[in-house]
């Protein structure tokens, strides 16, 4: 793909998300989603292969279906309210359809089936955009209309997403699929707290993007896509292998790393609102996620698979990826738990 065309597509994706973030008119929000989808499809197929074409087709069909449901909901809402403003949600059927459309775009269970398949079929760069930037727009719309969403429906989807995100990642050997199931579980945590404290959802989203970006950048640096190739990284970059281990544990939510902060704050907020069964269930299901992160950590850092070459790579095979952003990203992904009291006061 021509680099200029690729830059134009990325700018279109950013523009589509920006339109959604700044609009209070439903038609402009729908238009932003369409711009985002149409620009994302060529990005998914940047490195053309039959698998990438299949992934792009699955992405298009899912997103187009969600957009169709969203437009149907907007027309129903217009019939009953006579307005296009985002704050004026008066019809329960329209609210239900909008929730279904947004959760499809977000990849929440039970509409999660496209996320692992699409992520596995594309490059690491496209997978990073899909699992981070593309989550911002649906969550931003849900943030604005959370008062109109059925809380029982959203909490059921959230709990189901945490459960499926944990179970789905247990038997995976492909790193992109593992990160996709991790994304489903994290989206479940975010939507669970949205009804009680939407600002906490934004903090959770920020930390999730930081940790996921750190992991994908380390995967790209080492050109690893499977657990087997990940287990051989100690031979090339021993320091980065240790950093990868801590970032993985942070994604799993193990204290005293950054990833423990959002889980701690969400459980604290839920118990403060007299909810006991929900945070207990979420904490138990989070252990499944932590288990497959621990398994990845074990195969990455605590085992040394037999290899013929125990020396560093030859100069002509040295990796040329830039690592300027990795240091601050890894630091933020692992070491900002002490700032938790400040964030609790802010939210």
From Swiss-Prot:
Domain of life: Eukaryota
The reaction(s) this protein catalyses: a ubiquinone + NADH + 5 H(+)(in) = a ubiquinol + NAD(+) + 4 H(+)(out)
Any one of the GO BP annotations: mitochondrial electron transport, NADH to ubiquinone
InterPro entries linked to this entry: Complex_I_Subunit_2, NADH_DH_su2_C, NADH_UbQ_OxRdtase_chain2, ND/Mrp_TM
Pfam families linked to this entry: NADH_dehy_S2_C, Proton_antipo_M
TM annotation in the entry: 1-21, 25-45, 59-79, 96-116, 122-142, 145-165, 178-198, 200-220, 242-262, 274-294, 325-345
Keywords: Electron transport, Membrane, Mitochondrion, Mitochondrion inner membrane, NAD, Respiratory chain, Translocase, Transmembrane, Transmembrane helix, Transport, Ubiquinone
Subcellular location, record wording: Mitochondrion inner membrane
Catalytic activity, EC: 7.1.1.2
Topology versus the membrane: Multi-pass membrane protein
Molecular-function GO term, any one: NADH dehydrogenase (ubiquinone) activity
A Gene Ontology term for the protein's cellular component: mitochondrial inner membrane
Main function: Core subunit of the mitochondrial membrane respiratory chain NADH dehydrogenase (Complex I) which catalyzes electron transfer from NADH through the respiratory chain, using ubiquinone as an electron acceptor. Essential for the catalytic activity and assembly of complex I.
Family to which this protein belongs: Belongs to the complex I subunit 2 family.
Protein's recorded name: NADH-ubiquinone oxidoreductase chain 2
Species of the source: Myosorex kihaulei
The encoding gene: MT-ND2
């Amino acid at each position: 793909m021509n680099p200029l065309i690729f830059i134009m597509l990325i700018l279109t994706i950013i523009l589509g998300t920006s339109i959604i973030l700044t609009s209070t008119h439903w038609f402009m929000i729908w238009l932003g989603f369409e711009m985002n989808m149409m620009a994302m499809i060529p990005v998914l197929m940047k490195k053309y292969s039959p698998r990438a074409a299949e992934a792009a087709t699955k992405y298009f069909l899912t997103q187009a279906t969600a957009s169709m449901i969203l437009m149907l909901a907007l027309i129903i809402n217009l019939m009953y309210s006579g307005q296009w403003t985002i704050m004026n949600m008066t019809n329960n059927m329209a609210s239900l359809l909008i929730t279904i459309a947004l959760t499809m775009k977000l990849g929440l269970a039970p509409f999660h089936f496209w996320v692992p398949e699409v992520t596995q079929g594309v490059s690491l760069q496209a997978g990073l955009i899909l699992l981070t930037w593309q989550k911002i727009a649906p969550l931003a719309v849900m943030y604005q209309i959370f008062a109109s969403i059925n809380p029982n429906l959203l909490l059921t989807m959230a709990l189901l997403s945490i459960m499926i995100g944990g179970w789905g990642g247990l038997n995976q050997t492909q790193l992109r699929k593992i990160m996709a199931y991790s994304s489903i579980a994290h989206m479940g945590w975010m939507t669970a707290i949205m009804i009680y404290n939407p600002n906490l959802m934004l903090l959770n989203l920020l930390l999730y993007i930081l940790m996921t970006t750190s992991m994908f950048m380390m995967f790209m640096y080492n050109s690893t896509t499977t657990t087997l190739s990940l287990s051989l990284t100690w031979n090339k970059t021993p320091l980065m292998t240790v950093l990868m281990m801590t970032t993985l544990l942070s994604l799993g939510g193990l204290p005293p790393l950054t990833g423990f902060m959002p889980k701690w704050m969400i459980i604290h907020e839920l118990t403060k609102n007299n909810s006991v069964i929900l945070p207990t269930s979420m904490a138990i299901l989070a252990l499944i996620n932590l288990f497959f992160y621990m398994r990845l950590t074990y195969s990455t850092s605590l085992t040394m698979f037999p290899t013929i070459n125990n020396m560093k790579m030859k100069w002509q095979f040295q990796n040329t990826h830039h690592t300027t952003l990795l240091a601050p990203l890894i630091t933020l992904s692992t070491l900002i738990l002490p700032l938790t009291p400040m964030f609790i006061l802010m939210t």
